[in-house]
Amino acid sequence: MMMHMAETRTRPAPMMAASLQMVTADMIAAAAKRAEQRIAPLWPLRNFVAVNPYLGLLDYSFETAAELLARRAGARTTAPRAFYAQAIRDGRITDADLASALAEGSPSPGAPATVEALKAFALSNAPEPTFTTLPTVADVAREITGVNWADIVTDSISAWAGAYFDLGQSYWRSPWKPMSAYAAWRAEATYDRTPHIRGAQGFHQALRELPESAMETIIAAVEMLHIPADGLEAYLHRLLLTIHGWAGYARYLRWEAELYGGADHTLTDLLAIRLVWEVALWRSFASRGMAEAWRTRSHELVGDQLDAALQRAIAGDLLLQRAFEKAYQRQLFACLGTPKPVKHATRKRAQAAFCIDVRSEIFRRALETVTDEIETIGFAGFFGFPIEYVPLAETRGGAQCPVLLTPQFVIAESVGGASETEVTAVIEKRALNQRVAKVWRMFKFGPVSCFGFVGPVGLAYVRKLLLDTLGITRPVPHPATFGLDARTRERVKPSLEPRAIGGRTTGMSPEQRVNVAEGALKAMSLTSNFARLVLLAGHGSTTVNNPHATGLDCGACGGHTGEANVRVAVQILNDPAARTGLKARGIVIPDDTVFVAGLHDTTTDDVTIFDKNDIPASHADDLRRLEADLAAAGRLARAERAALLKIDPKGNIDGAVRQRSRDWSQVRPEWGLAGCAAFIAAPRDRTAGAKLDGRSFLHNYDWRQDEGFGVLELIMTAPMIVASWINLQYYGSTVDNRVFGSGNKTLHNVVGTLGVLEGNSGDLRVGLPWQSVHDGERYVHEPMRLHVMIEAPIEAMTAIIARHEQVRQLLDNGWLYLFALDERGKVTHTYAGGLRWEAC
């Protein structure tokens, strides 16, 4: 089965005479734009959503991108060879898998061409390849002086960026923050003598010579450094990768601006800053042969290719990676081919819809084991309600939808059953509590006042320190409830009624409510056969002392929990007026059907039901039975996860799991989406009973109910893309945590509340901590590309692929696999690239 044809792969251009052509300003500007597009965005910690680290390289094949990243970032794109060797020894990778991988073609001439040769390549003790990255002036300066100028430059830019981009962590605001990034950096650099002291005597001369405009600086610097035409994009991309994390954050700022129809030039500013340093070092060491050394090394930029030996090594590793994925495919196909028969009742006692998140698969399977009277459903965790949720006392909120989308509605938090006067009083009280807490925090952590705090006040914190350590209290209040008393917290809920907040109108009109409800139900393939209780369960996590906590929340909710979405959805779906509107559109919800909002805690596998007072007494027994079933399913799910968490199966599993969620020293409170490997869009019947080990995104989809295939198109352009982002984030963080991950969690220091450094210097780190993918002994996340399996007519899928460039790039260039399922859940065809399919 071929994912794509070898001959369609894009390869870097060879060295050509064009490299000697005149480099124009337009060429430089275009190359800068392309280099900037190669950088993947990095979301801040407040909503740390998973991002495909290879996002800017989708126009290359997976194999070509591996070579390009080795050259420009010194990055690996496969696991260490010993990983595949062990899989061969253990029998996970068979000779048939190796043969199947070879049958799809070699990524490079000279790579192992037979099963025996590939196996020998894997099992040999030959050293792993060492990549020599494309040169920068900072690299050449290190060769000339023996001083690590590359690290000095990165540290300097990072220290400045941490202050400039700070989102509220620092108490001393940068005086240049209102200026553009490049203007602010120039203003500060004028007074900074550090480069001069470190030996870059030409730094301030370069600063004076170069223009005040970022793009003009880029053009002037490239011209000064005589970068060859064929090496422009490679060189500029290489520079951005030396400040990968901060470039990623700047790319996020551009992403957000463009999503809302605006523009942002911060990434261009950062590229200009990095180029100023290049010119400064080039000038500073002119007397030590820099010009000649750089002239010689800069020719390496042309062609952007590895030597033949490294190409062969990478090609061999890519073949082993492909064989490893073939081994998983065998296992997955067999699992789907023998599903457990589903018992269909006339009407289910309850239906429970969960996010497609792989962690939900274990819980759904556990719930179906507890009772066959509950039908489970999988859908993106925002449940089709793309909202911005504004907390009490705030004027802006977070986007509770995938980052590919923009919120369509603004929903404000309110106090249930309260008058407008009471709501205003609660808002004012919360705002006051927040201001007081901020002043107190400034006193505790201020550079002078902290000494006064530790002496007279510090002893009063002994009790809290002890309680925090025991997991009885949180080290810091949860931001969702901070500033509210216990009684008010129980009454806080979303309000659908129109209100004016911050110059904007919140809420949803009656027609909007019907429209969004219709879209959500159709996308879930839930338009008939409603149970008496229908649970919509968003998900979130419970951890403490975890900067990346939002990365464990719902990616489909923009890095927030799904609580707001399900509570809004349930309010609308229980509204008689909305049901009347739905009935007119052919969706009849029985009068005795009640929708219930819940939240699945993926750390503890507890499910919380919201707004119980709104559930009619007629359904009290239904609710009691549902909660009992959810509790039983939680126990089963915790028992299954216990092995990965290394919890004694004979001990108190429930207590141990909950303790981890409150332990501020715990680096692995849960495994998140580690292991994610498949995305399945089909009726639940096709996967029910199959033990998918919490590795599959499960999306309910029945193409027979999808007239015009609008839902299929939505699945392939939103949830499938988001799942691939998650999968490739875990992939990159596993195969090369140095480049695509965030390193050792125990060394993290939060900077500006937006990201982390590893230690107290260096670049802003991207991706996941090492502890999120490795347990200290082995990989918990096994790196492999996502296997997408959809039950739908091939013609419909092909038409969608043809219409959407990003979907086609992902598939044609081998960034994920796509398989077609039949009505029995068996794989019948695989997408082979170029809008072609092959029978399995």
From Swiss-Prot:
InterPro entries documented for this protein: DabA
Chief place where the protein resides: membrane
Residues annotated for Zn(2+) binding in this entry: 355, 357, 539, 554
Keyword Transferase: no
Taxonomic superkingdom: Bacteria
Compartments where found: Cell membrane
One Gene Ontology term, aspect cellular component: plasma membrane
Cofactor (UniProt): Zn(2+)
Membrane topology of the entry: Peripheral membrane protein
Task performed by this protein: Part of an energy-coupled inorganic carbon pump.
HAMAP family for the chain: DabA
Name under which the protein is recorded: Probable inorganic carbon transporter subunit DabA
Organism: Roseiflexus castenholzii (strain DSM 13941 / HLO8)
